[in-house]
């Protein structure tokens, strides 16, 4: 299938290549020149979080994240330049996104698209270009339906059987059942157990703000190793290879979601300097996240 041809070379390296290309297309669609688009693509693809999820085997999540910018590129190109060609790119990319089979990431992507479309609607009303907006939206809606249709063999069984899983609720629940299961599916605490805590937000800018990974290797020059040796702890060399350095709210983690100080600085600078409705769309969805 076309989807399988998206990955060039051995995996997971091919996932990163797809991430670079995808974000490069998004920046081009937004009118950024080629050189800056290359730099932006590298910054997005080399984000520390991408390597963490690859390390722990979240391949479908990585692919879904890699395809997000390509989907957005289609939407942006449709509303900014050529509606039909943008919708075609959007349709193909969204079909691939759904095929990646990570509904959580696709749901977040849908929130971003919705925010962007609302921003375009506000702009269309302000600039009195509502007919063009409606035309483009029809193309995008049709592409969405076709993209979902190409994955109906995956979506339909998931929807049908989700009612019998721990995430879809069950009629077999005991009257006084406790824990994570509720009659309507999983409770909020369980569903958000691996979500970033508010106090962890500085990790985006400051690496290891809430510590590192739940199992990190420390140096023999560290104070921890020195104390272990002084205390006569046996096999201290082995102990420091699996030290818990994370103190955030999650049960455990492979490391912080560090986005890069320069990237975060440029993001904030863009929110201050740039004009237009797209800026407020990005700011709003970032606060919601």
Predicted features, each with a name:
Residues 1-12:
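Juxtamembrane segments of multi-pass membrane glycosylation machinery
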Residues 153-270:
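Periplasmic/ER-lumenal interhelical loops and adjacent helix-loop junctions
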Residues 131-159, 175-182, 283-289:
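Hydrophobic alpha-helical membrane-interfacial segments at the cytosolic entry of transmembrane helices
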Residues 14-30, 35-123, 136-158:
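Membrane-embedded helix bundles of polyisoprenyl
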């Amino acid at each position: 299938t076309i989807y399988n041809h998206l990955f060039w070379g051995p995996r997971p390296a091919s996932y990163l290549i797809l991430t670079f290309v995808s974000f490069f297309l998004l920046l081009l669609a937004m009118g950024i020149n080629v050189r800056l688009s290359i730099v932006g693509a590298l910054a997005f693809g080399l984000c520390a979080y991408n390597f963490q999820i690859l390390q722990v085997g979240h391949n479908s999540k990585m692919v879904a994240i890699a395809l997000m910018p390509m989907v957005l590129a289609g939407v942006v190109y449709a509303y900014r330049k050529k509606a039909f060609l943008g919708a075609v790119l959007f349709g193909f990319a969204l079909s691939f996104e759904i095929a990646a089979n990570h509904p959580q990431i696709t749901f977040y992507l849908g929130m971003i698209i919705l925010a962007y479309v609302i921003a375009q609607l506000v702009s269309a009303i302000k600039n009195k270009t509502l007919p063009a907006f409606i035309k483009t939206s029809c193309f995008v809606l049709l592409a969405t339906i076709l993209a979902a249709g190409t994955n109906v063999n995956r979506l339909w069984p998931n929807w049908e059987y989700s009612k019998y899983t721990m995430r879809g609720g069950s009629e077999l629940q005991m009257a006084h059942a406790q824990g994570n299961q509720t009659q309507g599916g999983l409770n909020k605490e369980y569903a958000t157990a691996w979500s970033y805590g508010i106090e962890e937000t500085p990790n985006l800018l400051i690496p290891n703000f809430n510590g590192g990974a739940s199992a990190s290797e420390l140096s023999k020059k560290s104070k921890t190793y020195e104390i272990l040796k002084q205390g006569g702890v046996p096999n201290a060399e082995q102990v420091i290879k699996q030290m818990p350095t994370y103190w955030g709210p999650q049960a455990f983690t492979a490391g912080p979601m560090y986005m890069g100080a320069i990237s975060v600085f440029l993001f904030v600078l863009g929110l201050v300097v740039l004009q237009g409705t797209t800026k407020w769309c990005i700011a709003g969805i970032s606060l919601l996240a």
